[in-house]
Amino acid sequence: KCLYCYKELKEGQKDFHPSCARKFFGTKDVPLLEYKHEELDQLAEQVIRAQTSLTGVQPKLSLNLDKHDGCSRLTIVGLWGDYIFKPQTESYVQLPENEDLTMHLAEAAKISVVPHSLIRLADGKLGYITKRIDRQENGEKIDMEDMCQLTQHPTEYKYKGSHEQIAKTISQYSNTPKLDLANYMQLLLFCFVTGNNDMHLKNLSLYRPAEDYQLTPAYDLLNV
């Protein structure tokens, strides 16, 4: 089945429908991801030394989409790549599949989510990939602040907030507070139904894609 939409593939198609690849990557064919899972630990160590890894308990790497002569590939870069990639982890089995499925369930519940998909490594193992929403197509930064920043909590206290505190923060900083509070409540109910016990302060953000600050589409959703 297609790793993006979960629908059946036609004969000769591999991993993605051409339309799904175009929708997510902007290319007719799936970009090459020429890394094996066994190489990722060493690569992660290199990027940590270079301070190019992204924050969070789940391993994350930043990827850039490079297009050359009709062939496109995803390469590990610094912090500001086009995509965020999460590989398999020994601590939690099939975590990429869990996250992608939960994001699909959220979409089915009419919750706005960031663009996301599964993608296959060179050795056949699956990883989770999501498109960054804090960058414009020209690479210019979009203002985005998570609830740790907005409530002045250091990252190590990301589990110390409350839903009441987050709701008050949305009311204070959002330019569309009533709409965002309604969307936030819908997301909370979804997390309760799916058993998500990891909705900490860094998993909720406000951003300014145009003139106004608003709640971002949902991201980092799990059923654990």
Short names for language-model regions:
Residues 1-38, 212-215:
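Regulatory N- and C-terminal appendages and interdomain linkers associated
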Residues 91-107, 162-224:
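Conserved kinase catalytic-core segment
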Residues 3, 18-22, 41, 45, ...:
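Generic detector of well-ordered alpha-helical segments enriched in charged/polar residues
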